[in-house]
Amino acid sequence: MKSSQSDYKKRGMLDMNLCNQLQEASYTELIDTLQSSHADWRTACIHLLSKKYNTHPQFTDVLLQQLVKEKALYTKIEIQTQLSQYGQISKMCQYLGCIGDNQYRAIPLRGSKKKSYPLPRDLIARSLAHMEVQRFQDFFVELPQLSYSQLLEAIDAFGFLCFYHQSLVNKETYEYIKTCILNYWDDDLMLWKLMTCLSAFPMAIDLLQELQTQQKHPTILMEVERSLKLLIN
């Protein structure tokens, strides 16, 4: 059934007319309006905060705290989009694995059969995955400091970025993934995600072929074979 204009408003679809009404609002006024019960007003506030006040010291905190409690679909999408562009990466990383319940908690029975790289399920990882390549190094230096649950989601963003931006594929990023494989060899969920990461690295063919002979877990083995197929074909 086709959604009505009212449905889109309730879900927080960005309305440029509202943005125009709020164009002259101060930072404090936008923060106050962000508490509105109307999702489309909240989306307009996020949009304008990002355009006008993205260098404010509390900008990233405001967006992250709103994302934690936000229910409206399009408002959440707007927050994620603006975090990708302007969010402080170190602060974003602290929220990895904390928002929503769509993350993998255990290795699935079957992996993806697609030729594309899987979109991260964690909302913050998804924002990180879509940031500009120029911001990658700021993300990369955060990885060693992350907790296990944070790294579990960060790896999805890392692989996504490397897969779609081959300029990020180099000895340093490849060695990092190999180190993770050694460190998490007995962790099926992390290892499965790392096998997906290897699909971004053309130099990983020999390693994947070796892993193909060693790996016994059926889902991990399927991911090894999927990555190999993508690299060879």
Residue ranges and their predicted role:
Residues 36-40, 71-72, 100-103, 117, ...:
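Short inter-helical turns and helix N-cap capping residues of alpha-solenoid HEAT/ARM repeat scaffolds
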Residues 2-22, 40-55, 65, 74-87, ...:
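Structural detector for internal amphipathic alpha-helices that build alpha-solenoid repeat scaffolds
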Residues 21-35, 53-68, 88-108, 133-144, ...:
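Amphipathic alpha-helical scaffolding segments comprising HEAT/armadillo-like alpha-solenoid repeats
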